[in-house]
């Protein structure tokens, strides 16, 4: 049974979400300010955190920034409906997914389960090998870690799965539709930029090659390719 941390100052919403998630087989704990939420999130007692942006004492973005310095705990951010900037910033600083308020509880559950499936590596398409290497990147599938020139990369669950998906097809184009289905566990929609933001974050963490070329190239209107040397 997965334990979910809810960080939101709307106590009524927390109660409703907790009741719904309980029926769906989750256990929950709710806190109502950013400082307490960060302390709880760093305790390693939870499988996932639901994090609101607008919080007293420490806002959701600051909580996520601090959390990502030392934790890979999956985070689903609650953003204001129609506020693209909140969504983009959240994804840029390490959120695994987002959901605008107000939301359908069924969609919340679907997104939680999708994130947890990715984290637990329940993916029929993963290769049989437990580890593999492409150029200067070493990947451990069992440990869910990736090293660049021997130094471990600080990747979120989504970024790790995205890197694996691209490296498995290194030198070949991977369609955005296929990446979205595999990495985000949902069909690609016309206005959803989540995948693009995760690719952008991954690019920043990988950096350029020694010849200043990009490791991940965008094939306009098609997808992405991890280049090989």
Model-derived regions, located:
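Short hydrophobic/Thr-rich beta-strand motif most characteristic of the beta2 strand and flanking loop
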Residues: 25-33, 40
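Charged docking surfaces used in two-component/phosphorelay signaling
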Residues: 12-23
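Short, Lys/Arg-enriched segments at the junction into DNA-binding effector domains
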Residues: 3, 114-173, 177
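Conserved sequence signature across two-component system core domains
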Residues: 7-8, 31, 49, 99
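DNA-binding patch around the recognition helix
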Residues: 124, 129-131, 154, 197-199, ...
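Active-site beta3 strand of CheY-like receiver
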Residues: 45-50, 55
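His-Asp phosphorelay/catalytic-motif detector in bacterial-type signaling
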Residues: 45-47, 70-75, 189
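Basic, amphipathic DNA-recognition helix from helix-turn-helix-like DNA-binding domains
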Residues: 59, 65, 69-70, 74-132
């Amino acid at each position: 049974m997965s334990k979910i941390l809810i960080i939101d100052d709307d106590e009524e919403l927390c109660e409703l979400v907790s009741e719904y998630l309980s029926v769906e087989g989750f256990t929950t704990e709710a806190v109502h300010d950013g400082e307490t939420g960060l302390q709880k999130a760093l305790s390693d007692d939870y499988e996932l955190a639901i994090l609101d942006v607008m919080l007293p004492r420490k806002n959701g973005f600051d909580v996520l920034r601090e959390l990502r310095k030392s934790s890979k705990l999956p985070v689903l951010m609650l953003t204001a409906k129609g506020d693209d900037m909140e969504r983009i910033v959240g994804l840029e600083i390490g959120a695994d997914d987002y959901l605008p308020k107000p939301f359908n509880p069924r969609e919340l559950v679907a997104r939680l389960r999708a994130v947890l499936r990715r984290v637990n590596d329940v993916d029929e398409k993963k290769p049989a090998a437990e580890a593999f290497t492409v150029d200067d990147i070493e990947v451990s599938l069992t440990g869910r870690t990736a090293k660049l020139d021997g130094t471990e990369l600080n990747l979120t669950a989504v970024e790790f799965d995205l890197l694996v998906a691209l490296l498995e097809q290194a030198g070949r184009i991977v369609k955005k539709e296929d990446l979205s289905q595999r990495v985000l566990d949902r069909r690609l929609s016309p206005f959803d930029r989540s995948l693009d933001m995760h690719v952008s974050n991954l690019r920043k963490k990988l950096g350029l090659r020694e010849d200043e070329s990009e490791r991940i190239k965008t094939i306009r209107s098609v997808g992405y390719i991890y280049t090989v040397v």
